[in-house]
Amino acid sequence: MIRVKVQVFLSLRNVIGQREVDLEIQNAKVRSVLSELHNRYGDRIQPPLIDSKTKEVNPYYLMLVNGRDLRNLPDRLDGELKEGDVVQLFPPAAGG
């Protein structure tokens, strides 16, 4: 089991109630972080973190692992995490 830090921004802070949360996960994969967040916060996170069709991170979200865009990492959601890694989640934002 490893511990990772998840930092959330914008509207996700309202859902989670804080800027960051420490998670202990058994399977040290990025996908496990999203599963644990879903287990804790469920349908309060909208849109869902995982796209139901592609099984990848919903394209509306930006997800960084240790400051690197998940979309540019070779294993994406199946990438291995290590103790102390930092995952950052940015929800969709609109502006004009």
Give the predicted meaning of each segment.
Residues M1-G95:
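Ubiquitin-like/PB1-type beta-grasp interaction modules and other compact soluble beta-rich domains
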